[in-house]
Curated annotation (Swiss-Prot):
Cu cation 1 binds at residues 82, 462. The lineage of its organism: Eukaryota, Viridiplantae, Streptophyta, Embryophyta, Tracheophyta. This is Laccase-4. The gene is IRX12. Residues 1-24 form the signal peptide. Cu cation 3 binds at residues 129, 464, 521.
Length: 558
């Protein structure tokens, strides 16, 4: 046998035992959904958790890895888990929103979510996608680059996951159920949370989260806003962040002392521990520039330099004012895609479907809603308040089950009016389970226009199954003649969750290259509950990898 053949056989045997560093892996996780007594704000309550942890466990993987996550439901509620921001290319069965892509996992039942992290790296997250269970059922999903592939920014010395949330002393299911009976808005949360801790609050001297750092080292903070209903500002006293990624997409780095992060969004920032030894206050506080009630309790934590005595005083900072629109706009307007050769911004430049969706609130008749004087607050897209079906939409589409949904969702508002101002006499909405159909690979431009019906408000809108580019935003009513002239088609930020500004509009573009049924909804949970949601039905293409895969055998049944 020649020396070349011996060497070849050695290499074959070597790589069969030691896989190449770039080879993707199959990673197995098990989520036991269980009740656990959790104490916060000096009171305890039975809480739905994953593996008895609040917040839930962080999932770690690498780009192109396959995840098999077995979810076992040990609680009295139906359960489903959404992997927020994961593209789920051809695997809509694993996306997770109950009654959209799957029937929920019933008590005592099991479902294994099986999907591949195709071409994605960065910080995403997971959460329950049924009822209000995501108040406590959530955690981070960290997707590292492939081995040997560096970050497109200076390598940090360490990484930390920071998940922001909200906490109610009362049972959240009772809170939303009572609100639905009354027709009014639910009670706001009792506190915000930083990695599951509020920090010391009035009448309850609890410990907050401590972020330990060493002088001179740089840390990558992976921020997630898992709050149900509130946009948040995030600050560290005396420190400046460098923003490097949002929604698992790299951005052109920029510096800021305040991060704005809406429910559903993720943001990666670099923090260099360049100050004198000490303890520095961390704040998570609400942003709301509309006359809407919010939880105004600021959650706090500390950045704790090594060698600092625990008795040392904490260096303080004031959070931004609740209505600090200019700070919010400065942050949002600084976001640009990296748009490098390795990470290009593939913005659609020709458009097949021009859509215009109004997003906002309304009032429908409710004779039993005594507190609401016979009316119920609802929410809608293009004046359609979405009604959840009794069975899941994706299986109904796949198996051609009739009578579950229609595909006549309006591409424009049924009534043209002064969306961002002026009074509206009829605030009623239509209801229905209506989808918008898109051919495979169609390009879409979608205008999301806030309305002032009842009150203007910032709506963080999340699209499942796709990333999209924000090509423009502004205040007032979108002008289809003037505003496109200012679109950014070169390096617009790429996201999966976008904030529609209060009293304004945002325009997104995406390519419908992922067949299936894909939910789009406001990520303020109260607005989703009220009906601010719809779904796109993306048809199969004609190529070999352009059709949705068959459903798994253990897909839950309704």
């Amino acid at each position: 046998m020649g020396s070349h053949m011996v060497w070849f056989l050695f290499l074959v045997s070597f790589f069969s035992v030691f896989p190449a560093p770039s080879e993707s892996m199959v990673r197995h996780y098990k989520f036991n959904v269980v009740m656990k007594n959790v104490t916060r704000l000096c009171s305890s309550k039975p809480t739905v958790t994953v593996n008895g942890r609040y917040p839930g466990p962080t999932i770690y993987a690498r780009e192109d890895d396959t995840l098999l996550i077995k979810v076992v439901n040990h609680v009295k509620y139906n359960v489903s888990i959404h992997w927020h921001g994961v593209r789920q290319v051809r695997t809509g069965w694993a996306d997770g929103p109950a009654y959209i892509t799957q029937c929920p996992i019933q008590p005592g039942q099991v479902y294994t979510y099986n999907y591949t992290l195709t071409g994605q790296r960065g910080t995403l997250w997971w959460h329950a996608h049924i009822l209000w269970l995501r108040a406590t059922v959530y955690g981070a999903l960290v997707i590292l680059p492939k081995r040997g592939v560096p970050y497109p920014f200076p390598k940090p010395d360490n990484e930390k996951v920071i998940v922001l949330g909200e906490w109610w002393k009362s049972d959240t299911e009772n809170i939303i159920n009572e609100a639905l009976k009354s027709g009014l808005a639910p009670n706001v949360s009792d506190s915000h949370m930083i990695n599951g801790h509020p920090g010391p609050v009035r009448n309850c001297p609890s410990q907050g989260y401590k972020l330990s750092v060493e002088n001179g080292k740089t840390y990558l903070l992976r921020l997630v806003n898992a709050a149900l209903n509130e946009e948040l500002f995030f600050k560290v006293a005396g420190h400046i962040f460098t923003v490097v990624e949002v929604d698992a997409v790299y951005v052109k780095p920029f510096k800021t002392d305040t991060v704005l992060i809406a429910p559903g969004q993720t943001t990666n920032v670099l923090l260099t521990a360049s100050k004198s030894a000490g303890k520095y206050l961390v704040t998570a506080s609400p942003f709301m520039d509309a006359p809407i009630a919010v939880d105004n309790v600021t959650a706090t934590a500390t950045v704790h330099y090594s060698g600092t005595l625990s008795s040392s005083p904490t260096i303080l900072t004031l959070p931004p004012p609740q209505n600090a629109t200019s700070i919010a706009n400065n942050f949002t307007n600084s976001l640009r895609s990296l748009n490098s050769k390795k990470y290009p911004a593939l913005v659609p430049t020709t458009i097949d479907h021009h859509l215009f969706f109004t997003v906002g609130l309304g009032l429908n008749a409710c004779p039993t809603c005594k507190a609401g004087n016979g009316s119920r607050v609802v929410a809608s897209i293009n004046n359609v308040t979405f009604i959840m079906p009794k069975t899941a939409l994706l299986p109904a589409h796949y198996f051609n089950t009739s009578g579950v949904f229609t595909t006549d969702f309006p591409k424009n508002p049924p009534h043209v009016f002064n969306y961002s101002g002026g009074s509206v006499t009829n605030m009623a909405t239509e209801t229905g389970t209506r989808l918008y159909k898109l051919p495979y690979n169609a390009t879409v431009q979608l205008v999301l226009q806030d309305t002032g019906v009842i009150a203007p408000e910032n709506h963080p809108v999340h699209l499942h199954g796709f990333n999209f580019f924000e090509v423009g935003r502004g205040l007032g009513n979108f002008n289809s003649t003037k505003d496109p002239k200012n679109f950014n088609l070169v390096d617009p930020v790429e996201r999966n969750t976008i904030g529609v500004p209060s009293g304004g509009w945002v325009v997104i573009r995406f390519r419908a290259d992922n067949p299936g049924v894909w939910f789009m909804h406001c990520h303020l949970e109260v607005h989703t509950t009220w009906g601010l949601k719809m779904a796109f039905l993306v048809e199969n293409g004609k190529g070999p990898n352009q059709s949705i895969l068959p459903p798994p055998k253990d897909l839950p049944k309704c």
